[in-house]
């Protein structure tokens, strides 16, 4: 990602994971179906991204954690209703539009209050537009995460269980 697309020196570039990148490009996330808004003030966006990544890895393993991971994702998905109550929608494009508007100080404060606790729940897809058409890169991303070089390659199953129990307890679905 680059802060200023006209500048091409290495300094303005930042590496971001696909989930974090989606939070920065909400308008594109909405168009590609890359996530929904949830109200989850108990945890931050980065923590949610880590939890969701663990959920997708566990679901891909097809072991005793698959059902637990599915329940954890279901619990997170129930928080869409809370986002809809607060904002009238769970579509990231709404949030992107509000953030790009020229708001008065009073309007910005009101928006900030409503948005406090709103998070982007990333889906199990990552669409890349190519000359040949749209391609879902998520299976390759998931394969890397599970590989020996990936972030979950060396993480024992016992740790995954702890992650899911902690996540479920935090959102009240223990």
Question: What name fits each language-model region?
Answer:
Residues 1-14:
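Short linker/helix segments within small regulatory modules
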Residues 13-33:
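Short Cys/His-centered divalent metal-binding micro-motifs
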Residues 24-25, 60-62, 88-93:
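Repeat-unit-sized solenoid/scaffold elements
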Residues 78-174:
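C-terminal, charged low-complexity interaction regions
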């Amino acid at each position: 990602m680059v802060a200023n697309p006209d500048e091409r020196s290495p300094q303005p570039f930042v590496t971001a994971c696909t989930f974090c990148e989606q939070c920065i490009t909400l308008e594109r996330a909405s168009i590609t179906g890359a996530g929904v808004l949830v109200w989850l003030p108990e945890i931050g966006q980065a923590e949610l991204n880590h939890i969701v990544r663990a959920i997708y890895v566990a679901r891909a393993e097809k072991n005793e954690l698959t059902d637990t991971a599915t329940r954890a994702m279901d619990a997170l998905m129930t928080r869409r209703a809370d986002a809809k109550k607060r904002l009238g929608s769970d579509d990231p494009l709404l949030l992107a539009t509000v953030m790009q508007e020229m708001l008065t100080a009073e309007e910005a404060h009101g928006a900030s209050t409503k948005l406090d606790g709103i998070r982007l729940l990333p889906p199990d897809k990552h669409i890349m537009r190519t000359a040949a058409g749209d391609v879902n890169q998520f299976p390759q991303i998931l394969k890397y995460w599970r590989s020996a070089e990936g972030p979950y390659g060396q993480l024992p199953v016992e740790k995954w269980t702890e992650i899911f129990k902690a996540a479920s307890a935090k959102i009240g679905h223990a």
